[in-house]
Amino acid sequence: MCLRFWPVALLLAFPLAAVGADAVVAQPTTVLRGGRLFDATDTTLTENPGLVVRAGKVVDRGPMDLDTTGARVVQLDDEHVILPGFVDLHAHYAVDFFDAGRAEETDGYPLLYLASGATTTFTAGEMQPDTMRRLRRAIDRGDRIGPRLLTSGPYFGKARPGWDTTRTPASIRREVDQWTARGVEHFKAKRMQADLLRALIDQAHRHDATVTGHLGSGYGQSVNPRTAIDMGIDRIEHFLGGAQLPDTASAYESLPTATPDKAAFDRITRHFREHNVHFDATITAYGYYGTRESDLYADWANAQQYLTPYLRSVLSESDYQAPISRFQRIFELKLDRIKAFYEAGAGDLITLGTDHPSWGEYLAPFGVHRELQAFVRAGIPEAAALRIATINGARAVGMSDRIGTVEVGKWADLVVVRGNPLADIRNTRNVEWVMTRGRLHRAEALRDAAQGTVGPEGAAEADAFKPEASR
């Protein structure tokens, strides 16, 4: 699909040097003074002692008699709070505006994810992996602005359009080799049978890559998360699994009516802990399909302003998703289960994932704030929710030595919000500055640049958003 390139210099707080994610080149020094700091190394909020950023990293922290000649000094006020950048491990860029299949949205979404404070996003299964690879490389070169993009490549399993049901473990291994050679370090399985999943996990690990899975109850040819954990999977999406998901029906059919089984829940929680497997809860993804009665789903971002005028016109005559009682029940159960998982000592294994392939009513990049609010609504403390969104995600993808906390020597991926999120988690919505790769962006400028960019500009472009129509 067509990429509409935005002039990078217009969106930056200071000039950009074209540079990949890991490269170190000469950059201006930035000093952040004032405000308060939640560094995610623990659960406390402190006065910001002063942060010095150079060459994309935090190089000093603390009271300084620093010669700031030539540096950009940003003076924050008492209402500002500095946080580590958010890590969204189920960040779909795919949209389905025309009920004709999902297509990757690569114009406005990178700006909006970053403007929301998500400095690292994992795509969790791609419909157009070549498109997402081009976007990742453009961001890494500095030609585009967006989060650190952890691309997954295509879905592995029947969720992939055109999936060959005669696939063998050997063919899976060959494809893993191909995608890792193209820069994929994290894979996503969905609707994949056991022998193929085992091959995917083993071959990915040979490349030091990770695997996550949208799995099932064990019904039919689906794989229960407990079985996948025994295979060595790194992360699980959506459902904890175990005996609390009976294998007599699909997960979506059995979960809403299953009788709560504390012993089964305790066993699967212990299995996650013993194998250090992370759980991506994706709570709010299910609420989108429910009644959406809570303020979790308020349109505080005025999301429609980011759609192209043409798409707004088309969608104005569409009926959005009607509530589905089964998904409302799943949403409520997930709120209950995530708190129980946290209280069982598995809080360090929870990660944040938004998972919302938008049909236009809501836009996925704003989901990180809804998911944070859902954790708190479930009964998880605000500080723990922030750690879930930062250091937990970094650990889950093997990047905790580089991102996830604000510490000297780590990459300078930071978010500055107005208002204390430990007092009201909804204050994370008030993003004023985002720093990624050590470069400071005004969130308002990113949002302004994204206005009217999401979706086709006219009927001639609409076919690019209708992949199933061309099959």
Give the location of each predicted region.
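Active-site neighborhoods of metal-dependent hydrolases
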Residues: 178-186, 234, 244-378, 451-457, ...
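Histidine-rich, glycine-flanked metal-binding segment
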Residues: 37, 41-83
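Bacterial N-terminal signal peptides
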Residues: 6-18
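Active-site-adjacent beta->alpha loops and helix N-cap segments on the catalytic face
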Residues: 128-134, 191-203, 249-250, 271
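Acidic, glycine-enriched loop/beta-strand segments at the rims
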Residues: 37-50, 62-64, 363, 381-386, ...
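Acidic/histidine-rich helix-loop elements
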Residues: 91-105, 156-168, 245-258, 318-330
